[in-house]
Curated annotation (Swiss-Prot):
In the hair cortex, hair keratin intermediate filaments are embedded in an interfilamentous matrix, consisting of hair keratin-associated proteins (KRTAP), which are essential for the formation of a rigid and resistant hair shaft through their extensive disulfide bond cross-linking with abundant cysteine residues of hair keratins. The matrix proteins include the high-sulfur and high-glycine-tyrosine keratins. GO terms for molecular function: identical protein binding. Belongs to the KRTAP type 9 family. Sequence repeats lie at residues 8-12, 13-17, 18-22, 37-41, 42-46, 51-55, 61-65, 66-70, 75-79, 80-84, 85-89, 90-94, 95-99, 140-144, 145-149, 150-154, 164-168. It comes from the Eukaryota. GO terms for cellular component: cytosol; keratin filament. This is Keratin-associated protein 9-2. Keywords: Keratin, Repeat. Coiled coil: none annotated. Interacts with hair keratins.
Amino acid sequence: MTHCCSPCCQPTCCRTTCCRTTCWKPTTVTTCSSTPCCQPTCCVSSCCQPCCCPTCCQNTCCRTTCCQPTCVTSCYQPSCCSTPCCQPTCCGSSCCGQTSCGQSSSCTPVYCRRTCYYPTNVCLPGCLNQSCGSSCCQPCCHPACCETTCCRTTCFQPTCVSSCCQPSCC
């Protein structure tokens, strides 16, 4: 019987074989998984985030950091998806130079204005003023806080402080 899972757009395609849609590119699999067939999911692992960029998910999983989806070589474990890692993601008009995801070394503090809607605590960037070099300064959700002072994020409410916080305060 001819396999109809190319592409698998309807449930009738999955009578003899299942198919998995990786972004917009369907692939045939030999056995049915625990999840329903023919679902437009990027990864088998439940911890993989939805892929916003179709080109990211041809052969890899993807994870969204800030506003940009990032391709990774393998699916993460469920425990890692709630913890942001250092990925080279550009936020707003400035590109923060983080180290690669998965490295044990901590991110180098950078000075960029965070304009993402919900910036993740990726590289702990300081203020626009490079004199604010303390690694404990949290990402600045409010750009107005970062012109001459540092800001500390408490939950989702940023507050401006008059000077850089000490490493013990964050």
